């Protein structure tokens, strides 16, 4: 149930909020796509942990780059 809520929240963000922000993620795949993939692969708790860790790295002082879900 929590996994579904988290996934739908991310999809809402991707569809309605992200287009107005422009491309600002330093990583590929983007942080929202990474979060969806980690939730799908690892489930809610571990996927949320990976997502938060990734979002914490997404700032101007981190070089970014290719960082897939492992």
Curated annotation (Swiss-Prot):
Keywords: Cell inner membrane, Cell membrane, Membrane. GO terms for cellular component: plasma membrane. The keyword Hydrolase does not apply. Pfam families: YidD. InterPro entries: Membr_insert_effic_factor_YidD (IPR002696). SMART domains: Haemolytic. It comes from the Bacteria. Its main location: membrane. It is found in: Cell inner membrane. It is a peripheral membrane protein. The keyword tRNA processing does not apply. Belongs to the UPF0161 family. Could be involved in insertion of integral membrane proteins into the membrane. This is Putative membrane protein insertion efficiency factor.
